[in-house]
Amino acid sequence: MKILVDENMPYVEPLFGDLGEIIPVNGRTLTAAQVRDADVLLVRSVTKVNAELLSDNHQLKFVGSATIGTDHVDLAYLGERNIPFSNAPGCNATAVGEFAFIAMLELAQRFDSPLKGKVVGIVGAGNTGTATAKCLQAYGIKVLLNDPIKEKQGDPRSFVSLETIMAQADIISLHVPITRTGEHKTKHLFDEARLTALKPNTWLVNCCRGDVIDNKALVRVKRQRDDLKLVLDVWEGEPTPMPELVPLAEFATPHIAGYSLEGKARGTFMLYQKLCQLLNIAADKSLLDLLPSFNIKAVELATAPDEKALLQLARFVYDLRDDDKMFRNIFLNENGFDTMRKNHRHRREFSALALAYDRQLEVDWLSNLGFSGVGQ
């Protein structure tokens, strides 16, 4: 069995090596000729899976995407050809949630404006939005959720309108899929009018899709409003973001919010489980066995951490400033965006760091944030 796999997917060899011949490929430049004789195709969001890519292949048994979203896959076409498909919903939700939370802590420190006491509006209450809310609520932050689709579907959580978030939230974090038509279109959801209407000193965090914000309008509005603070992990026109926009963001990264070691391993592992199920064989590999031990064994706390100390704990796991600095130095280079993504030194999630502190009730919130070993 020939397994064609994006070269940037981790842990492919230990998981799929027993199932067939593994052929790594560049996902962004993948051609129909390369795919012609593949039995299994494993991709990420940079690969457009459609008739143009697959029309010459008449033996494909499975297409898997190690991503939350599926907007890069023509699901109708796969359905017409009866090609089984699976993605990895939620695989990197924890990573995105922690990234957004860390970014907010970094902004709070940079501008001496504590996160504690602020109101955060989350637009999109799916896997990544929910994970972001979980971090914030663990820390005691008031969260407003906006998701008209989930609200209409009967999700029991409390939702508010986008207008309410615009009026009440100090921070707005975006977590919607990209939809270009229909009642709940998200392309340019934040257009020039909505960006202009943001209340003073709003922090705007985008970890979903670049097209959700009109980037040209964002440049114009930001140049007029220095009070707005931006954290941008996604960009219109990836992998070539607007050169004028990057310097206007407080933190800028190349679509890596979901790039934790745990998240990327989880995505590959979910596809492994699905393929084994399809082939009717036992999935006898373990996700935990894939992950290396963390380079810090444990952190012993003398007191319950304040916000500054919490940021330091977060930086032990992931220092956003490093990726921001690297991105600013490389994004104008040819292939700089993709090079940084490909060579990203997969950060860890909070669960990799064990904390030792004996007053359990004072630090339950750290366990809820995801840190391990608290109070043990």
Curated annotation (Swiss-Prot):
GO biological process, one term: pyridoxine biosynthetic process
InterPro entries: D-iso_2-hydroxyacid_DH_PdxB (IPR050418), D-isomer_2_OHA_DH_cat_dom (IPR006139), D-isomer_DH_CS (IPR029753), D-isomer_DH_NAD-bd (IPR006140), Erythronate-4-P_DHase (IPR020921), Erythronate-4-P_DHase_dimer (IPR024531), NAD(P)-bd_dom_sf (IPR036291), PdxB_dimer_sf (IPR038251)
Annotated positions binding NAD(+): 147, 233, 258
Compartments, record wording: Cytoplasm
PROSITE patterns: D_2_HYDROXYACID_DH_3 (PS00671)
Lineage top rank: taxon: Bacteria
Entry's Gene Ontology molecular function annotations: 4-phosphoerythronate dehydrogenase activity; NAD binding; protein dimerization activity
Pathway listed: Cofactor biosynthesis; pyridoxine 5'-phosphate biosynthesis; pyridoxine 5'-phosphate from D-erythrose 4-phosphate: step 2/5
Enzyme active site: 209, 238, 255 (proton donor)
GO cellular component: cytoplasm
Catalytically driven reaction(s): 4-phospho-D-erythronate + NAD(+) = (R)-3-hydroxy-2-oxo-4-phosphooxybutanoate + NADH + H(+)
UniProt keyword list: Cytoplasm, NAD, Oxidoreductase, Pyridoxine biosynthesis
EC number: 1.1.1.290
Pfam families for this protein: 2-Hacid_dh, 2-Hacid_dh_C, DUF3410
Keyword Nucleotide-binding appears in the UniProt entry: no
Binding-site residues, substrate: 45, 67, 259
Assembly: Homodimer.
Similarity annotation: Belongs to the D-isomer specific 2-hydroxyacid dehydrogenase family. PdxB subfamily.
Free-text function comment from the UniProt entry: Catalyzes the oxidation of erythronate-4-phosphate to 3-hydroxy-2-oxo-4-phosphonooxybutanoate.
UniProt-recorded name of the protein: Erythronate-4-phosphate dehydrogenase
Species of origin: Shewanella putrefaciens (strain CN-32 / ATCC BAA-453)
